[in-house]
Amino acid sequence: MKKFMQESVNEQRPDKIFADAKEVEITRAIAKEFYDVLQDRAESDIIIIGAGPAGLTASRELSLMGYKVLVIEQNNYLGGGYWLGGYMMNPVTVRAPAQKIWDELGIPYKKVGDGLYLTPGPHAVSKLIGAACDAGVKFLNLTKFDDLVMRHGRVAGIVVNWMPVSALPRNITCVDPVALEAKLIIDASGHDSVAVKRLVDRQLVEWKGMNPMWVEDGEEHVVHKTGEVYPGLVLSLIHISEPTRPY
């Protein structure tokens, strides 16, 4: 009876689908790939803080130009607020001529007004993430910006730590950060402006505060004022109109 049951089980077992791989091989592969990326991008041409739409778009464009680009993101996922258009609703909009970026990435959209275009946020952000990866951009997610590396009056890199460290009590998380260096840092962290605020704390940049919402005026500022706010540090996104240099 026992032999018959065993034969029945064997007969019902389907053909093998997946290749053989030991658990330790998987662990080594993950650890090695992470180490290789960190070793290669610890010194990059450009480091971008924030993997929202601004950071992802900039990283793709710069990588296609031949620069070695690293993006850090404090969340486990990439895309920032691009997943949602507002008030927890996921359609997102752009005004002409910004839809040309959607054309370039193959993102479908529809016209909903005079010069106003709409697409599902998940579709747009997934295409943009894929395009950045295809261009050669590397990412460190769950990585939190802590401070700037400064040399001779110029931003030369950033100081980072694991994001979960900041969520634990300090008395049990004596975990030192590490430094990453680059020729240029781009702060694409959104309204937090984490890198710029480190300069404000040291009175190297003046901060006039955030203006009330005005889409047309704010988006024009993004285009016209994106640039260096301090040697080695470029600021992007809507907060570009907020800081000024005192020198």
Model-based region annotation:
Residues 1-45, 162:
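Extreme N-terminal leader/targeting segments of oxidoreductases
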